[in-house]
Amino acid sequence: ASDVYKRQDYKDIQLSVSSARIIPSFFTMHDLSTLYSALLKLRYADLNIDWTQNATLSRIIAAEMLRGRDYLMSDNNLDSFLYAMNNKVAMTKDIPVLNLLIGNYGDEEMEATLDINSRSITNSQIIIAGATGSGKTNLLAVLIQQFRMLSTESQYPVNFLLFDYKGEFSDIQNNHWLSLFDVDRSCILDPLTQPLPFTPFKDFTGRSINEINLYSTEMSSALCSIDRVSASANMNNRLSEAIVEAYKSTNGAPISFELMLKCYQSRMKDANNDDSISSVLKQLVNAHIFESEDKVSLIDDSYIIKMDGYPKDGPIAKAIVYFLMSKLNNIYELLDKQAVNDEVVQIRHFSIIDEAHYMLDFDNRPLRNLIAVGRNKGLSIILATQNMSSFKSKGFDFYANAQYPLIMKQQTIDDKVIKDLFGVSGQELQEIRTAIAGLQKGELIIKDQMAFALGMGNKYKKINVTHLI
């Protein structure tokens, strides 16, 4: 390639915010780092590039991969490559086995693992209840590290989306944590400094008006719920109509909060006299937390959303989580079923919501939908909250839909939750209460599925969680 061509390439790579990032382990996998280094330095020999910058290196690698893609897609090059490598069957067999090693069982020094994707597992959801100081953050880190370690060097990497309510994972002081998850600081998104690079709204281009009507009703309910708005029937109808009108004006393309507010105010008697709905919409407009279009794919990479700049129970924090869960729903509706082989199914992505109790006290339909149907598309969700009773919401039983409820140290112990979760009463109930009360930092109890099925022995096991961070 000419020098001019290479210079233009590098300029494009620098300016491309949406360029794919390649995980750090890519450069050391199969001991090929020396070869990669030599090839890159030879190709870009005339440019002054700082090769120590992971973000720059990742984008250059991505550009080279795209160049390779263009070559493979021309003529019959791809078919020739697949035939030569005999790789079609190997790709399916390469689905990683996600047996997450999270610690050991009590004093037995026996490894404690969570089977996430074998074909016998009905779902892949994990819920965690642990009070402040229970070791919940470390457990989340262990789970993320295991998902990534077991998958990133395969052809089926499992990416993640973490809502960092406390700002611990995005804290520069904890920068060394990121390498444990095979990411760097470019994965951290701070909506206080820059809008999140996604539109939260669904694309209805070419779809029926009935679909928009249904969506507008759901969206109206959500906007009222995230700030506990007391909205009259007229206000709800007005908001639904405003959403439909906004979509009509974009011919079904994703709308914005600004357009929604404008359409809503046009239906108010006095647009200068805010009601509770226009007040919420103005907060969302002023916060400018989302872009008006997708600039990156939410599931094709890993992201940490820095949330500590917003009140945890405020409308902005709730809107971020709600609308990104809704976004995941929209994405997964369009995906094919995940890859499967004789032993395991593919897990594409997992979302982690810490301080999840703030998202469980209202009818969070996108979250419920993801938990209910996510397994069929290769999605896992990890919810963490401080109190075990938070997962017993009025409209949805999160315990019944979780494969692995993990109970850590509690401030208050809910007998009803224990009865439902472990199927115990009387003396067995007291034993589990005592076990929970005696948990120390970094310890948890989990239902013993075998004892539960046989109806004999202790209905729980205690796990000492690996100390990672």
Residue ranges of each PLM-predicted region?
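Short, positively charged interaction helices/loops
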Residues: 7-44
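Short, small-residue-biased leader/transition segments that mark boundaries at the very start
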Residues: 1-5
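P-loop NTPase motor domains
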Residues: 101, 107, 142-379, 392-394, ...
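P-loop NTPase motor core of the ASCE superfamily
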Residues: 116, 391-469
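H-loop/switch region of ABC-family ATPase nucleotide-binding domains
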Residues: 385
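Conserved lysine of the Walker
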Residues: 136
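Phospho-regulated, low-complexity intrinsically disordered regions of nuclear gene-regulatory
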Residues: 33-84
